[in-house]
Structure formats: C-alpha cells, structure tokens
Amino acid sequence: MRAEILAVGTELLLGQIANTNAQYISSKLPEAGVGVYYHSVVGDNPDRLEDCLKLALKRCDIVITTGGLGPTQDDLTKETISRVCGKKLVLHQESLNDIRNYFSSLGRQMTPNNEKQAYMPEGCIILKNTNGTAPGCIIETGGKIVVMLPGPPAEMKPMFLDYVIPYFKNKGAYSIESVILRVFGIGESAMETKIMDLIDAQTNPTIATYAKEGEVSIRVTASVLKGESADSILIPVVNEIKRRTGDNLYSDKDKTLDAVVAELLTKNNITIGTAESCTGGLISEKLTDIPGISQVFMGGAVTYSNEAKVEYLGVKEQTIKAHGAVSRETASEMAEGIRKRLKTDIGISVTGIAGPGGGTAEKPVGLVYIGLSSESGTVTKELRLSGNRKKIRTITALNVFDLIRRHILKLKIDL
C-alpha cells in the first residue's frame, strides 16, 4: 500500500513550525505494511487543498492528512475532503458529547463554533480524540483510503497509534520489518562503498544508508506476508553488514551512542566523571538525560578557564604554559584530575577550540583533545573537526562516547 502524507496549515508553509507530524507518521507506517511515497504541504486554502488531495488520490492508495480539523473558519480539511469524496457531513452526537465534556473538564464554556468539529463525513470511521476536541476519521472510497488527523502532535500521535496503525495492520496482506544499524567513525560514502555490492543486489530486503551528525545509520527493511517472520531474510544481510563494519558498529537496535555508553557503564557498574571545556557540559547533559545514570555518573565540571583547570582539576600551571590549554598534555591531566577528585573508575576530559574565533595557524578552530583516565592509565586523542561551533561540540561529544565505549569493550582506540 502506497501512502502520501498531506500536512495542512499555512503556518507550515511560512516556516513558523516544523512538520514533525509527517516525520513521525513516516517512521511508524512501515510496521503496518504501508510505504510512504510522498510528503506534501498545503496552506489553509480549500482550492489548493482540493488540488493536492486529487493528485494524492491519483498516485497513492492512502492519503493521510494532518491539521485543519479545528473549530475556526480556516479549518477546512474535513469539508474539502468530504466534498471531493462525495460525502455529506452529518452530526455525530457522541463526538459532540465528547467535545462538551472536554470543555466541562477544564471548567470552560464551549463556544458554538466548536460544534463544527462534531460534523463527520457520512459512513466514516470515527477516531476518538482523548487529548483535545477535534476527532479524526477514516474514509474508504473508490478503493482509496483517506485518514484525517488533528494537527497538534499531542493529539495526533496517540490517535495515530491507537487507531490508525491497528487499522492498517488489519487491512494489509504484508508487514514490513526493519533493523537499523548505527555506525560511528566511518563516513556515509565510505560506508556505502563497503556495502555497495549488497545495495546493488538488493531486492528484499532493501538497504539504505543515511548520515546524521558524524554517524551513519543503515536501515535494512524486509517485506513479508502478515504473520510470517522476516528473520530468515533479514538476519543474513544484517550479519554481513555487521561483519563489514566491525568495531565501528555500536548498535543494531537503533540506539544512540550516548544511550549505548550509559548502558555499558551501568551494566558493568563503572563510575564516571567529566571535565569539560569547549563542550560546556554537553557530555554531562547527554548522560543525565538517560534514566538510571545516577548510579554511575558521579559528577561533571565545566573548567573553561585555565585557572579552573589548575584549581579544580590539579592541572599543572607549567603544563599549560609549556603546551597550552588545548593540548594532549592538558587533556591528560584534566582526565586524571577529575577521576581523582570524584574517585571514579573513569575520568573524561575535553579541551579544544570550537570557534568561530580563537584559532591560530598552529592550533586552528576545530582542534580538540579528548582524554580518558582509568586505573590502567590515561589515553588522549586528537580531533581535527570542521563546521560551526554547535557541530564541533556535537561531534566532540560523539567521539568522547565512542572512546568510552571502546575502552569498556577493550576495542582498538586510534589515537
């Protein structure tokens, strides 16, 4: 089944809000055996919406709309779709009662225009909205399926999961299963080269690579008859990709690198402390975003100035004078200092130049040193990164997590 997602709202066209609904729906539909072929966005204009809808119905089996179901005059999605599909709008009393109860629960008076939301296309499947006022619906017409969902993500997501996904799972003869492998330390073009023969030979399963913030994800997707397992066609391909990616593969369950590291730390009861300069606490933030990390994360220090490095971490003044704050030597003493101060199994350090200023010919913007100190010794790694300040900080954090991962798993560390 081929689907098009049609987002309705002038605010989307103006760039005032991001179209996160389409991304979310696209990520979930494959598990119900539905492939997304197109994304479209149209403003709150009934004529242009009608044009987009007719095109979508011509080229796809399924059209899923988001937005335009509210009580105001510019909320015209339901009216436009009903007209195109030849359906009358009729009052659905249960939906009207739900809307009244919603306002009552908030202690507010329902204005008359809200009644508009309870008028539904005749013969449609009603999708109850337990998080707002506008119900959604599904129309089956002429061998096509049109799904209307509210625009606010807090209303759309539960409605989509509770009603739409089960609906399509019951409809389709096929289901789609995917495995997502995540790799760090190999660029997208190099990764694609490693598996090009697999990509060229793909039929079922299919293989796709995509890059994001210094890492590469590889999606392996299989289509099987509903009720059958995809393991027999997925596992051989996944295992071959794992073999070719080697130590650079850090997850076969679509987990982030920081989540994988947090799991390794807690599973092995390895305590950790961080000393950060140019990343400004980013590594600590990413760790503390993960539930349960408190049992191993003892604390972090943002030692931005030379004085803080000396006074809090015990970095020698002579080290900074001789080698500079951005150096292997300083990174080494920072990692050792935080480990000793917090009495942890691992001490992590970062010192570098994130830009846009501060660089020299000898030490340019993007030069970063990271360090890891443990009972077995201290290692440091030099990074030469490019991009803006945010990107340099983000890629640095990923390199730190990869360093921790490799240390715990006793993998090779390229210094």
UniProtKB/Swiss-Prot annotation:
Entry's family note: Belongs to the CinA family.
CDD domains recorded: cinA
Protein known as: Putative competence-damage inducible protein
Organism per entry: Ruminiclostridium cellulolyticum (strain ATCC 35319 / DSM 5812 / JCM 6584 / H10)
Domain of life: Bacteria
Coiled-coil blocks: none
Alphabetical list of InterPro entries matching this protein: CinA (IPR050101), CinA-like_C (IPR036653), CinA_C (IPR008136), CinA_KH (IPR041424), Competence-induced_CinA (IPR008135), MoaB/Mog-like_dom_sf (IPR036425), MoaB/Mog_dom (IPR001453)
PANTHER family (alphabetical): NICOTINAMIDE-NUCLEOTIDE AMIDOHYDROLASE PNCC, NMN AMIDOHYDROLASE-LIKE PROTEIN YFAY
